[in-house]
Amino acid sequence: VPITEQDRLAGDDPAAPPEALAGGAHATGATQRSRAKETRRQALLSAAASLFAVNGFNRVSLEDLGAAAGVSGPAVYRHFPGKQAVLGALLLSVSQDLLDGGQSVVAAAGDPASALARLVQFHVDFALSNPDVIRVQDRDFSNLSADDQAQVRALQRSYVELWVDVLAGIHSETDTADLRMRAHATFGLINSTPHSVRNHGRRMAIKSARPLLENMALAALTAPA
């Protein structure tokens, strides 16, 4: 892959020593390099989501990742220490985004019913927008390092408990374990749909699936115990 000016800004030129990338730079140049590097990093994560979803983590090489993002395989090391670190960054990032987004949704709601409706809309939007990441999480979680597994689990537990707290405001007399089961069942319903829709080639369902998923999820979450 030819080295371009964007590669050099992103630090992807393997011939450039580290001091040449950092030393003597003006603030503007440093900012440009920082932005270019983050852009390249995000491109690698996007490529990883797609390639891991289609082929599985074990069948994707660093060269595959680099080529999909427009860099050489060795250049990937400028952004991640290895392929497992790419997987970790991908699943940690999406888990943190889910938690942060869910917390923002709940904070903006005026009451539990509104919070629940907004959470459902938020998660449906996430699932329809990120089917590849969901597939990678389901299939390749075991390929994470032990530390990344622990961090992803902690973030996702916090996300589940966010839903449980909102549900408790609606079902005040229902056992917490039951509320947690409702949340997990809802995630299963919502998360499984986008890939099944895409795998059957029915792109039309992306538009029609949104209200259907939202209504089904809310019906399950608000049904009497």
Model-predicted regions and their roles:
Residues 1-28, 125, 160-169, 173, ...:
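C-terminal peripheral helix-coil segments that are non-catalytic and often amphipathic
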Residues 39-43, 47-85, 89:
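Helix-turn-helix
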Residues 40, 83, 94, 98, ...:
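Hydrophobic/aromatic residues within well-ordered alpha-helical segments
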Residues 90-117:
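Amphipathic alpha-helical linker/stalk segments
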Residues 96-99, 146-171, 180-184, 207, ...:
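Amphipathic alpha-helical packing segments from all-alpha helical-bundle domains
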Residues 117-138, 187:
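Helical hydrophobic small-molecule/effector-binding pocket
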Residues 128-147, 195-198:
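Amphipathic alpha-helical segments used for helix-helix packing
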